[in-house]
Amino acid sequence: MLEVAILSGTVYGTAEEVARHAEQRLRDAGLEARHLPRIEFEALLALDPQALLVVTATTGAGETPDALQDLLDEIVANQPDWRGRPLAVIGLGDTAYGEDFCAAALQAHMRLLALGMRDLLSQLQLDASETVTPEEDAEPWLARLAERLLAAR
């Protein structure tokens, strides 16, 4: 069974709520999905997930929340052999911040693609100016993600 690791970076908890919702939706679809909100690099490496879903908010001036930033830095520094593994990213932001909108998700996406991971689906960007139910807004995208992950097994 394809194992999907769900990593999240949050400031106020919304990204973790979306990540937990994604975990349940992917499990409902028949995938082995695990939300790992504060996993250390070595533990993630030992888990050896076949796919990654990153769910992150953007904080400050386009920054990634600290815990996820530290993990991404370690992943990039150690360059695990994840070439060809499926990657998907959900960004949470607010268009009121202009060009910093979903900047953390864009940075995470680019850094993981540079390791050779395979983009499975266009990044989902959820705008806090337009929604108060990001979990519900993610539903159609999560359904497409589940279909593509099941096909990738």
Annotated model-derived regions:
Residues 41-42, 60:
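Short, catalytically relevant binding-site loops at active-site mouths
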Residues 29-41:
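A short beta-strand-loop structural module common to alpha/beta enzyme folds
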Residues 2-3, 13-17, 25, 29, ...:
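FMN-binding flavodoxin-like domain, especially the glycine-rich phosphate-binding loop
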Residues 7-11:
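A domain-level signal for caspase-like cysteine endopeptidase catalytic cores
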Residues 42-48:
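Short amphipathic alpha-helix with an adjacent loop that forms part of the alpha/beta core around
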